[in-house]
Structures are given as C-alpha cells and as structure tokens.
Amino acid sequence: MTIKDIAREAGCSVGTVSRVLNHNPTVRAATRARVTAVMQQYGYQPNANAKHLKQHVREGLALVIKGTQNALFADLLDKLQACVEARGYTPTVYYINEASDEMATVQMICTERRPHGIFFIGSHPHCFTPALANLGLPCLLLTNNAAEQHIPNLSSVSVDDRAAAAALITRLARRGHKVIGIIGGDPADSRPSQRRLSGCRDAMAQLRLPFDFDTQYAFADFSMEEGYQAAGQLVDKCPGLTAIFAMSDLMALGAIRALQDRGLRVPQDMAVAGYDGIVLGRYTVPRLTTIRQNTTVLAERAADILLRCIEENAPAAHEIVPFEWVEGESV
C-alpha cells in the first residue's frame, strides 16, 4: 500500500495524505478522519526516513507574477502570501516579464521545486494550454477569468472587468460627461483592456454617447509615463473631451499630471477616473476616483479555492468577486 493508494481510496490528493502524515493542522478534520480511517483499514505504516527527507519540500507553493511595475500586483502578492502562510504553506515567488512563456515557467518550477500548487498573477488566460492538465497539480489565475479555457486543473478569481468599466462610464455620464476618452492597453493583446473596452462600449451604446476609437482611445502600457503621454494625445485629437477613463490608477495619475502641465484643472476642466484602487491614489491631489479591486477578498478567495483543490482534491472553480466604486476628488 503506497501513499498514492491511500489518496485514491480516501478521495483526496497525495499532498493531503502527506499533510496528514506530517500532522499539519491546516487539514480539515473530516479529511483527516477519512485519510486516517483508510490507513487503519489497510494497516499502512509510513516510511519514517522517506518522510523526513521529503517533509521540507511538501508544503511549497509557487507564486508567479507577470509584470514587476504593477502596484496592484504588489499589494495582491503581499496579501496572498499572508493567506497561504497562515494555512501552513511556504510560498516561493517568481517574477516573469511580459514576454515570458508561462508553460515553460511551470515546467521549470515543477522540475526544481515540486510544489503543491501554483498561483499566477497578471497572466493572460490564452497563455495556458491543455498541456497544463498533464502536470497533475492545481493552478489558479488571479485578476483574469480562465473559465473559457476549460483546463481541468486551472481555477481563477477575478473582478468582472466588463461590468466594472460599464458602471464607471455610466457614472461619468450621469455627471454630465458626453465625450469620454479612454486610456488602455492594446485590446488585441491585453485581456483586461479588451474586457474593459467592451464594458465602455456597452455603456456608451446604451446611453447613446458618441465613441470613435481613433479619436477617443489612446494606447498605453499601464505606467504613469505612458498615461501622461496618452492623456496629451487625447486632448490633442478629441475636441469636446471632458472626461478620461484610464484603465489603471497609475495611468490615471500620469494623465492628471499631463493635464495639469497643460494648465487644465482636474476635475473642473477635465474629469479623470482610474481602475484598481491602489493605495497611492488616496494621497494624490486631487484624490483619485476609481474602481477598486478588493485585493483582500481576491487573495482570500484565491487561497481558499487553490488549497481546497490541493487538500480535498476539489475540482477547479472560477469566481467573480465584487468591484467597488471609490469616490475621490478627480471627477
């Protein structure tokens, strides 16, 4: 009788059986009782030497962060680390750039670390292929919805970007803004930009607001510098512009500075709204109005879902968490 046999009979993962053997307190009582009953039924006795050798690597989780300049991801990472450490796991963080191959990164991590599971923050769903299922360990994507990928071991937790962007445009319209410019990434390459642009289009169509992509959309790479440049482009090419929606808070802060450098007052001459709800936006002048992604809820739900997959062999799950409107002073 091997540990794999015990896991199969108990209906859980090998990692969960290992945690029971190591007396890890994070295993749920019902799961521990089920595993213990199977071991007693078959008279299973663990190999003490093997247990000692493997114990130090059995509690590992990998956290893969795509993009090193994103303030939202930094906050999310801190809270996610705290969540998994409280459950008895040791996270190892890997930073990858925008051009990195997630599947190659996963193969490297599994070869070097043999983790229980992997979190991805900031990756795009299309980066994952069905080959991910062959690795045999639970994975979870944060900040993007992976339900449409139909990969059996890939879960996701995210905000509904489309609905959030639509809600923001609706609020701007209710305050009298009819010509609204948008700063965002390339919708062809960025899933968040695509979803948020779709939400903007939904609201504008419903409210019968004008929208011309060529004059009312400016490309930027989610940084303050790019937001600064994009805001200037919108002012130059879009007559009648009275409000700007930037698809990240950092771009919004850059946009505000660009407008001020041109002698425009925010919000008296031009309203600016962001997206993410990072801490920095609370301390700018004016204080930033934005859509907040609640990083505490995102981290808690992500940790709970992935650890259920690890400890209880639960199926992949895809959860949408609520977004929040943050009333600042920039609209």
Regions found by a protein language model. Give the residues of each.
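Periplasmic-binding protein-like
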Residues: 114-121, 181-184, 217, 238-248, ...
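N-terminal helix-turn-helix DNA-binding module of bacterial transcription factors
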Residues: 1-58
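Hinge/beta->alpha junction and helix N-cap segments in small-molecule ligand-binding domains
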Residues: 65-75, 93-101, 156-167, 183-230, ...
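Flexible loop/turn connectors
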Residues: 154, 230-331
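Short acidic capping loops at alpha-helix termini that bridge into adjacent secondary structure
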Residues: 178-179, 211-216, 266-269
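Alpha-helical recognition/docking segments in bacterial nutrient-uptake
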Residues: 56-170, 236
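Short beta-strand segments enriched in small/hydrophobic residues
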Residues: 14-16, 53-69, 171, 179-186
